[in-house]
Curated annotation (Swiss-Prot):
Its main location: cytoplasm. Functions in the N-end rule pathway of protein degradation where it conjugates Leu from its aminoacyl-tRNA to the N-termini of proteins containing an N-terminal aspartate or glutamate. Belongs to the R-transferase family. Bpt subfamily. The keyword Ligase does not apply. It catalyses: N-terminal L-glutamyl-[protein] + L-leucyl-tRNA(Leu) = N-terminal L-leucyl-L-glutamyl-[protein] + tRNA(Leu) + H(+); N-terminal L-aspartyl-[protein] + L-leucyl-tRNA(Leu) = N-terminal L-leucyl-L-aspartyl-[protein] + tRNA(Leu) + H(+). One of its GO terms (biological process) is ubiquitin-dependent protein catabolic process via the N-end rule pathway. It comes from the Bacteria. It comes from Allorhizobium ampelinum (strain ATCC BAA-846 / DSM 112012 / S4). It is found in: Cytoplasm. One of its GO terms (molecular function) is leucyl-tRNA--protein transferase activity. This is Aspartate/glutamate leucyltransferase. Its EC number is 2.3.2.29. One of its GO terms (cellular component) is cytoplasm. Signal peptide: none annotated.
């Protein structure tokens, strides 16, 4: 058997399915399995090539008539928060964050279900069980961490931690952090916890000497993805490679 062929990733193409972002469009994805000793290396290369990870699968859009999904990464070392982001950082200055191995907890799942029930009732993840959640967190052959964000302790003398309000599942790559999935307490809208987690990942990337924070795909016109282009400067993966994004006028500075 050819050793190279045995260790090289095999790519597959999904059947057409309704697009979750653009009404009336059909989506297809190309995907491969991230398993074995080369999984971290492959995750690095594929993420840099516009793929995203979900459990032990790396995928990217391969739609026949649409190229709306654009991979986005923040240039961490050049990032400058705008006025709104500085306010968000200040509002959440009381939160503590801790990094853990990719292992699920009952507390995380409870917050996850609350988030889905309020934000994504009709989404493809809406019926996920505790087992599904555990698989989402644990089924990784790459360097994955869980970051928990908590309120201060109610009683400083107690061993009980503060309330869990946000969680990020993130991969550590050779050139950045990739935010695989994040969720938060939807009742704390004034805290803008989604924005805060991105800001925290930018801070962490800089502390680790990593140049990028990967946010996944941005679709122009999709409200649920609009937040991604507010973190500047950033690069978009186009036909000519990673290209500096030049925002239109009106983006808050």
């Amino acid at each position: 058997m050819n050793t190279q062929a045995a260790t090289s990733p095999q790519f597959y193409l999904t059947a057409p399915a309704p697009c979750p972002y653009l009404a009336g469009e059909m989506e297809r994805k190309v995907f491969t399995h991230l398993v074995g000793p080369r999984a971290p290396e492959m995750n690095d290369l594929l993420t840099q090539g516009g793929f995203r990870r979900s459990q032990n699968i790396a995928y990217r859009p391969a739609c026949e008539t649409c190229r709306a999904c654009i991979s986005v990464r923040i240039v961490a070392r050049e990032f400058q928060p705008n006025r709104t982001m500085r306010r968000v950082a200040g509002v959440n200055a009381d939160l503590t964050s801790s990094v853990f191995a990719a292992q699920p907890s009952t507390e995380q799942f409870s917050l996850f279900r609350t988030y889905l029930d309020h934000r994504h009732q009709q989404g493809g993840m809406s019926d996920m069980s505790a087992l599904d959640f555990a698989i989402m967190v644990e089924d990784s052959h790459v360097k994955t961490k869980v970051i928990e964000y908590r309120l201060p302790k109610v009683d400083e003398d107690s061993d009980r931690p503060g309330e869990l309000v946000a969680v990020a599942l993130s991969d550590i790559l050779s050139d950045g952090l990739s935010m695989v999935y994040s969720f938060f307490n939807p009742a704390m809208e004034k805290r803008s916890l989604g924005t805060f987690m991105v800001l925290d990942h930018i801070r962490r990337a800089n502390e680790m000497g990593l140049p990028h924070v990967y946010l996944g795909y941005w679709v122009n016109g999709s409200r649920k993805m609009g937040y991604k282009i507010r973190f500047l400067p950033q690069e978009h993966l186009l036909s000519q490679g990673w290209t500096r994004y030049e925002p239109e006028s009106g983006v808050e500075e």
